[in-house]
């Protein structure tokens, strides 16, 4: 038995090579599309119309950069048979036909526009045109009279769909269920993304000293991640000193001072797959209150990890975490996200979601192939410090494997005096 997590999930180099099996992207595309179609059957949907960016990438393997993330300016249609169809932002439709010619042509990669989130009003006719094209594609597929799932649409577009006689229902649950079980290729990509953050935490640990700002850490982390191949840094939480309690969920330009406890969360995207990965340090020297807070956070984490295996349920995990009132909050809604578990994949918050807020009443079964993060938070008795830990893990046939490997067994003191 090892005393700390070691690399047991492969994280090969990120280049394409002829001498080693790495990620098979064609296999990845086929797996994801098959998962979506399985859920269309399970949820009795003739098709799903996707506006949410992570869903579009999962189902169609297309993306145009994160400037367009969840702006509603592109959408996709997936039916139980045939090729997905993408309506994209202007010239991006032509680019897809060039980039993936075996998947897209002039019939299923076309331009589309629903008004740029209201910047172009319904009087332009763009909303009505988009829905006419969607309905025509559904009729061509023979499913226009079926239940049609929609994930996250603008109100104006949704109303136009209903006016056109489409039987629109919730499609997001089908997509969430599709995404909850990861393929071996997805697990490699998620592990590679974590390996990048392992390296950034080494840099943060060496960087932490008085005079460095929270925002300086954020800037360095962005540069390092992009240098290693990240395609998008969604967030770097950088929280120090009295800002640790309560958790503000946003960095500032505060100067780090001797004795500060500081915690960080790095959320970035590599080849479409995210990380959510907290670590806590203290600068120069640590008080007993800070060490005690870290110890509590680690104990809650270890108790949760010990329960993770196929057949376990999310309420069993949530029950080992303290109640909101036990660490300074009025109720579970106010404390939500502090003792927390969530799937990680093409989206930041996927199934299963684990917390005392939702899991005690509506537990879900843990399944092999799930990949999720567990997060714990313990405020210190000094009223200002706090410890925050997060581990990502893969559910295996007989337990789980941790893939976030920067040391976290005990409180680490950066640049110790």
Predicted regions and their residues:
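Active-site neighborhoods and metal-handling regions in enzymes and metal-associated proteins
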Residues: 1-417
